[in-house]
Design a protein with these regions (language model features):
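Positively charged n-region of N-terminal signal peptides that target proteins for export
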Residues: 1-4
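Bacterial N-terminal signal peptides
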Residues: 6-17
């Protein structure tokens, strides 16, 4: 249900265009969710949840989780207008050889919601953050279905 609502929020964000961005003097999403301390706590919980999630933890078996947690913080801080610069690789390059499925991407999304719940970020703010991340799915997921019917348009991918 949360995933559906997250997708619904994405549509609302895309339709609303720049309405998701803070105007002059308005607090940013970064500030609204609680700033650095809250976001760092959420990313720490997120990594802990991922580590214990048998649906996806194998993907991170050879990952430096401290560095990964920092990259997550930078990325989330950046997209929520916290003033951070993301120093990691782009999503397509970082995930190119991992063969991540839609099911694994959805599991990661569920884990993110759980992390946000654990640090008491309100659900409406969770949806705003997830909506900002949702466009990355195309660069991360590698099991896009391609129809065998030549009359059906096939995704071009990257």
């Amino acid at each position: 249900m949360k995933l559906f609502l997250g997708c619904l929020c994405l549509v609302a964000t895309l339709v609303g265009g720049g309405a998701a961005l803070a105007g002059p003097g308005a607090p940013t999403l970064f500030e609204t969710i609680g700033g650095e301390a809250k976001l760092r706590a959420a990313m720490h919980e997120f990594v802990l949840i991922i580590e214990s999630d048998d649906r996806i933890n194998f993907t991170f078996a050879n990952t430096d989780l401290k560095k990964f947690e920092q990259f997550l913080y930078e990325q989330f801080c950046n997209i929520t207008q916290g003033g951070c610069q993301y120093t990691g690789r782009d999503m397509y390059t970082a995930h190119a050889k991992l063969n991540i499925t839609n099911a694994e991407f959805n599991a990661l999304t569920e884990d993110l919601y759980e992390a946000f719940d654990r640090v008491h970020i309100p659900y409406r703010l969770q949806n705003k953050v997830v909506a900002m991340l949702a466009p990355m799915q195309h660069d991360v997921v590698k099991d896009h279905v391609v129809s065998q019917d030549p009359a059906v348009a096939k995704p071009t991918g990257k």
